[in-house]
């Protein structure tokens, strides 16, 4: 995960001071890319403990098409709770857009299922994309998507994925996002009968909140440890049947967790 730590260091040294929606303030740079070879280990940050169950449960929640935070809360995951209404609803956020994008003619489009079908039938297509940035529904979302577009690519029997993240909270969010879309790549590859290739993360506004700087510096003082290995229950190949209990990380030995406030 040296690429991630190098980006944190770069923002600390060269980031522009900017104001933001939350009133917290950030150090920010614009435009950055990181690449992770998924055969070389599962890219989960080791310089602090990352909430693995939260990563996995959130992704499976997206895949189910859910938009209610109570489903996550029932599993001990509260990362979406600050933005939920009293009933737990978040509006048409990620899950709704992935699984039931509302078209202008009233149809609901299952983008994720379309991509799975196309990966099998036309693996060399350049249209293996899923977007969560539905301009017509942004105002109804309690939090517009930060990681808003991902694309799959097949070469030599391997599946790679690139994510575009318009807004990248480097200390709290990005370690989660890297792990989430790396897990998605593994699960989709298994569903369509491919091996894994790379996960490529592309960020727009890459920032550290001003009240995360001390924690970021502490993280940089820690030596990275070997990456864990992801194991998926061999009896489960259907993406839509995967549950947290089917996933296991072997060899995850991170440094202690570092806490920081969430900018809401």
UniProtKB/Swiss-Prot annotation:
The active site is at residue 146. DUMP binds at residues 21, 126-127, 166-169, 177, 207-209. Keywords: Cytoplasm, Methyltransferase, Nucleotide biosynthesis, Transferase. It holds the Pfam family Thymidylat_synt. Pathway: Pyrimidine metabolism; dTTP biosynthesis. GO terms for molecular function: thymidylate synthase activity. One of its GO terms (cellular component) is cytosol. It is an enzyme of class 2 (transferase). It is found in: Cytoplasm. It catalyses: dUMP + (6R)-5,10-methylene-5,6,7,8-tetrahydrofolate = 7,8-dihydrofolate + dTMP. PROSITE patterns: THYMIDYLATE_SYNTHASE (PS00091). Its main location: cytoplasm. (6R)-5,10-methylene-5,6,7,8-tetrahydrofolate binds at residues 169, 263. PANTHER family: THYMIDYLATE SYNTHASE (PTHR11548:SF9), THYMIDYLATE SYNTHASE 1 (PTHR11548). This is Thymidylate synthase.
